[in-house]
Amino acid sequence: MKDLNYFYYSKSFNFKYAIFFVLLLLWVTSIKAQTSSEVYKKLKKLNFLGSVLYLAAHPDDENTRVISYFSNHVLARTAYLSMTRGDGGQNLIGAELREALGLIRTQELLSARKIDGGSQFFTMANDFGYSKNPTETLTIWDKDQVLEQTIDRIQKFKPDIIINRFNSGSSGRTHGHHTASAMISEWAYEALHKNEKAWQPKRVFHNTSRYFYGNRENFKKANREGMVAINVGGFDPLTGKTNSEIAALSRSQHKSQGFGSAAALGERMEYLELVKGKKLSTNNPFEGIDTKWTRIKGGSPIGKAINKIIDDFDFSAPYKSAPPLLEVKAMIFQLNDTHWKKVKIKEINSLIVQCLGLKLQFNAQMPYGVVGEDLQLKLIANNPSPLTVVLKGIEFKGEAYDLNFSLKTNRLFNKSFDTKTSGAISSPYWLTQKGTQGMYITDKKEWIGRAKPPAAYKAKI
């Protein structure tokens, strides 16, 4: 039986890395182990430093084939920014409409992203219903606010490339929200490239198709210069699925809209038309963008270390990768690049837990509570690996509890905590104040863009 602390001291690790790992690793209610193939894929993703932001107007506007392709095959950080939450749509599964429908469609998007591997963001724009043109849309929306929120999300996510679902020149030929979303994306790009201190995406693409050209024949005749053709129908042996199958499962989460998508087997082409940025000489949308650890000063040794972990990965004993990942984590801590440091520390923390196969749950014993009511919380932990992990303690609601429990192989730990329900009443942050026809309003400025508010309680394990 080995103890993880051994790897810190025998390798002359600074103790602060161990403390940071133990205290700040988990902020969620449940962590479950993943298969070795899933862990291996995330190891490879740890070695890719590139980001893609897909942008459109509503839930279900996103092209899940493209999102899944970049997330699962290119291994880029991938996200979908939807201008609205789809409040103005139909509902084929219930009676909920308007704000209640927006809540349902928000959850449908989150379910879709869990499948295709992307992240999900929003602006505070309201889907007020069908709009004839972008001029009308941008009059009812607060154009400046939506643009500011889009710029802010780009600054936080830092995409290398942005992909618009719609064409900014399609006024009058499609939903005004659609065209407006592309216009806002291009305005954001232009504004950021006027600010030398801002994060500047390298390119903006339009995810074009024959639909935007009227028919298949017109699309065949189109000038393909500056257009990237990507085959999104490839097979992923680590999941046993084609990209089309993953995308179809993701697309089928839009149940309120009656959407379901059967996977089309074989080659499936998607086209990205360059709208803004440096022209391409190859079929690679990341052309000229360093997506390796060499993009960061001092990052080259980290890439080499991760490559060795990938080469040495034991599918029958993934826990063997945990100690070298701890060493890589210490190397990442030394970097000056705060953005990629934050992104990759989060990824590597998750990977260490998954390599060990740790199962951690911290749950309330009832789904709802009234302020002042007695509340019981239960912590469950299990470590199936032959490495000993020490459960040092837990903090929640301003209280700290020392545990110092050695999680030896498959030894179950469980402990209950009694407290009282307190704090603000849980509510979707965009619905706590009366909005306008075109915009939701909140005083929680730091939450704008998030799919949902933070959990009522957070725990540090």
Name each model-derived stretch.
Residues 408-460:
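Eukaryote-biased detector of low-complexity, proline/serine/threonine-rich segments
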Residues 395-402:
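Short, solvent-exposed loop/linker segments at beta-strand-coil boundaries, enriched for Pro/Gly
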Residues 367-373:
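Short, solvent-exposed loop/linker segments at the N-terminal edge
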Residues 18-29:
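Bacterial N-terminal signal peptides
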Residues 13, 34-198, 210-211:
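Active-site beta-strand->loop->alpha-helix modules in alpha/beta enzyme cores, enriched
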